[in-house]
Swiss-Prot record:
The keyword Nucleus applies. Residues 359-373 have a biased composition (Polar residues). Homodimer or heterodimer with other bHLH-Zip transcription factors. Binds DNA as a homodimer or as a heterodimer. Heterotetramer of two MAF and two USF2. Interacts with PAX6; the interaction is direct. Interacts with MYB; interaction takes place weakly in normal T-cells and increases in T-cells following stimulation through the TCR engagement. Interacts with MYB; the ternary complex formed with MYB and the CD13 promoter is regulated in response to differentiating signals. Interacts with USF2; the interaction inhibits its DNA-binding activity on the L7 promoter. InterPro entries: bZIP, bZIP_Maf, bZIP_sf, Maf_TF_N, TF_DNA-bd_sf, Transcription_factor_Maf_fam. The gene is MAF. Expressed in endothelial cells. This is Transcription factor Maf. It comes from Homo sapiens. Residues 288-351 form the bZIP domain. Induction: Up-regulated with tert-butyl hydroquinone (t-BHQ). One of its GO terms (biological process) is in utero embryonic development. It comes from the Eukaryota. SUPFAM superfamilies: A DNA-binding domain in eukaryotic transcription factors, Leucine zipper domain. Residues 72-82, 196-210 have a biased composition (Low complexity). There is a cross-link at residues 29, 33, 331 (Glycyl lysine isopeptide (Lys-Gly) (interchain with G-Cter in SUMO2)).
């Protein structure tokens, strides 16, 4: 792998910014694919067509669309030594980019291609912050030292590469999800859950500056069109990032009404009044408050029932004690009456046995023992 990546010093750019851009990527992750002679010819044709300003976002599988261009070395213009840089286009630098470039399918201008790619950017599976940063550095180096830092001309950062870099930066600013493909940065999407309006706008401006630098370095109608497309892509990314910063569930208010309504207010408030107070509140918050109100009502009903049961039990116990006292009193009365009855019966038996009756007793005296009862 190292022997295949080895290149002569004349082919490598001597700018420190370009070398830093190359060092930002883990080159061991990229696949090196050697194509036959026909594939090299097709690649050169695709490079010339892309440099002419015709881009397409259709995912069709064609010989031209199967080999994407290089980020830092676009198709060279005629007479710029294409034999020395032809093997550089064999490196697949966009391994995670799902959109295929097919210049022969539709006759899109660079502006139309940028808009089409941005509109379909939700299909991307990861961000390309490293690519955008490297493209910005290369574009700045190409604009500052035209001919000194990148081999003597701005052709190293061609218009097609500038347009593609601007599209990638805009897509990364708009999607804002997925892991970053730096060699040492592997952040989850949740770490960037609270975006600000300034960061996506900065990414969009960086993409616009990269596109403008590519257009200035190329020189000619096609280069000017590529620069304009890159600037448009950057602006779109900045606008999308600024809009994405205002996510609905990150509102500063919080929409939590626990402090606004006390438990007593939730229980005593009527349903109509509660619905009037909850106008404009999210559905989840309304459901949560109504469930809390129902729980408080059930809890209050259970406490009321428990209190009533305890109170009724106390009343019944007091009545039971009173009834037991009355029963005891009645038992005492019964026992007293039984004793009196026994005493009278014994007295009667004594009188009968002593010969109470006499022979000449008058009829006024009772003759039946029941009289003494």
């Amino acid at each position: 792998m190292a022997s295949e990546l080895a290149m002569s010093n004349s082919d490598l750019p001597t700018s420190p910014l370009a070398m830093e851009y190359v060092n930002d990527f883990d080159l061991m992750k990229f696949e090196v694919k050697k194509e036959p002679v026909e594939t090299d010819r097709i690649i050169s044709q695709c490079g010339r067509l892309i440099a002419g300003g015709s881009l397409s976002s259709t995912p069709m599988s064609t010989p031209c669309s199967s080999v994407p261009p290089s980020p830092s070395f676009s198709a060279p213009s005629p007479g710029s030594g294409s034999e020395q840089k032809a093997h550089l286009e064999d490196y697949y630098w966009m391994t995670g980019y799902p959109q295929q470039l097919n210049p022969e399918a539709l006759g899109f201008s660079p502006e139309d291609a940028v808009e089409a790619l941005i509109s379909n950017s939700h299909q991307l599976q990861g961000g390309f912050d490293g690519y955008a940063r490297g493209a910005q550095q290369l574009a700045a180096a190409a604009g500052a030292g035209a001919g000194a830092s990148l081999g003597g001309s701005g052709e190293e950062m061609g218009p097609a590469a500038a347009v593609v870099s601007a599209v990638i930066a805009a897509a990364a600013a708009q999607s804002g999800a997925g892991p970053h493909y730096h060699h040492h940065h592997h952040h989850a999407a949740g770490h960037h859950h609270h975006p600000t309006a300034g960061a996506p706008g900065a990414a969009g401006s960086a993409a616009a500056s990269a596109g403008g630098a590519g257009g200035a370095g190329g020189g000619g109608p096609a280069s000017a069109g590529g620069g304009g497309g890159g600037g448009g892509g950057g602006g779109g990314g900045g606008a999308a990032g600024a809009g994405g910063a205002l996510h609905p569930h990150h509102a500063a208010g919080g929409l939590h009404f626990d402090d606004r309504f006390s438990d007593e207010q939730l229980v005593t408030m009527s349903v109509r009044e509660l619905n009037r107070q909850l106008r404009g509140v999210s559905k989840e918050e309304v459901i949560r408050l109504k469930q809390k109100r129902r729980t408080l009502k059930n809890r209050g009903y259970a406490q009321s029932c428990r209190f009533k049961r305890v109170q009724q039990r106390h009343v019944l116990e007091s009545e039971k004690n009173q009834l037991l006292q009355q029963v005891d009193h009645l038992k005492q009365e019964i026992s007293r009456l039984v004793r009196e009855r026994d005493a009278y019966k014994e007295k009667y038996e004594k009188l009968v046995s002593s010969g109470f009756r006499e022979n000449g007793s008058s009829s006024d005296n009772p003759s039946s023992p029941e009289f003494f009862m």
